[in-house]
């Protein structure tokens, strides 16, 4: 149980102190769980200001300013990209950190409430499901142009000429990939360092989505952001892949094939992390994902992921969303169990 000051955990009659920045690590965990539940219920209302948009605005501002100052010199662009990354992650971590520290000094419950709201806005579970289902409903209406438009909101590839099959694959791929980027990775960093560390992660992820491209504009300037994103997702992507395999079994999909394709195709992507979850989705649903796509008008060659056991269908979008939700719950429960295991180990060592 918890002590009244929200700074300690009572296990077996012993008090264990886990206080951090004026609030407790237990408070972080409680905020994580509460924020996750709020996200499942409310998602991201369009009228509510979103902190990730503020991070995006900061990235856009620094992007234009730095590139205008640096010109076309490769070394200067590499350095400028590093300056961008350091500046954005510094702001993204320190602002919520000191807000929570100040709130914790005023009242621990105020700090918990603020961190819960932060965690809620960081998660993207319901938003990802809702946006991908807009693609699904457009396909059911046989409105391919509308489906292309809806897909363009959640993918980076060119969607103007995509067929219905390619639209479905794009939606399945982005749900699978963003299961890691939008839910499990933020959850992982919240578990380690609360909302501030999760905001730091989201800032890296946002920079990668805005400047981490291998095109003429960002090949050098965006390299640091892209590499940082690869590093930040290294562990969460693999946690997501493993959890998705178990989620596929819970959802009644092809567990054995999910494991097989994960093990075989988990590196079949230009990113070292993206295929970790996409391979599981392909295997669980008995479909083939990946392949070549156009980005900013240029053809990008990609390996395929999975076997073409059957043709894709709109229902696959609903199926991958079920895997998304099951994966999120599995990871949430796993992190809670890890927390209590660590607490019990520390308690036993202190008693000894």
Question: Predicted regions span which residues?
Answer:
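Hydrophobic alpha-helical transmembrane segments
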Residues: 3, 12-200, 204, 212-352
């Amino acid at each position: 149980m918890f002590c009244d000051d929200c700074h300690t955990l009572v296990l077996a009659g012993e008090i264990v102190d886990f206080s951090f920045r004026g609030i407790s690590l237990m408070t972080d965990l409680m905020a994580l769980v509460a924020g996750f539940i709020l996200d499942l219920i409310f998602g991201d209302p369009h009228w509510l200001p979103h902190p990730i948009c503020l991070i995006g605005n900061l990235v856009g501002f620094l992007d234009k300013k730095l590139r205008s100052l640096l010109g076309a010199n490769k070394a200067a662009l590499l350095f400028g990209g590093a300056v961008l990354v350091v500046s954005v992650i510094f702001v993204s971590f320190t602002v919520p950190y000191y807000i929570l520290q100040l709130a914790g000094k005023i009242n621990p419950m105020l700090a918990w409430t603020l961190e819960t709201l932060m965690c809620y806005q960081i998660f993207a579970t319901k938003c990802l499901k809702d946006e991908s289902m807009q693609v699904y409903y457009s396909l059911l209406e046989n409105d391919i142009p509308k489906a292309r438009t809806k897909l363009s909101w959640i993918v980076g590839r060119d969607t103007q000429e995509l067929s219905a099959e390619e639209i479905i694959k794009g939606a399945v791929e982005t749900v699978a990939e963003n299961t890691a980027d939008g839910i499990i990775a933020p959850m992982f960093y919240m578990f380690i360092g609360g909302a501030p560390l999760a905001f730091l992660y989201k800032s890296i992820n946002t920079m990668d989505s805005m400047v981490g491209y291998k095109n003429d504009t960002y090949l050098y300037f965006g390299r640091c952001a892209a590499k940082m994103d690869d590093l930040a997702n290294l562990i969460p992507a693999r946690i997501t892949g493993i959890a998705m395999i178990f989620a596929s079994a819970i959802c009644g999909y092809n567990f054995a094939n999910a494991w097989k394709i994960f093990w075989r195709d988990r590196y079949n992507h230009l990113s070292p992390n993206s295929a970790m979850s996409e391979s599981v989705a392909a295997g669980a649903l008995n479909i083939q994902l990946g392949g070549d796509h156009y980005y900013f008008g240029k053809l990008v060659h990609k390996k395929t992921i999975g076997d073409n056991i059957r043709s894709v269908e709109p229902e696959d979008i609903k199926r991958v969303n079920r895997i998304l939700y099951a994966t999120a719950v599995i990871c949430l429960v796993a992190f809670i169990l890890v927390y209590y295991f660590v607490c019990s180990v520390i308690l036993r060592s202190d008693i000894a």
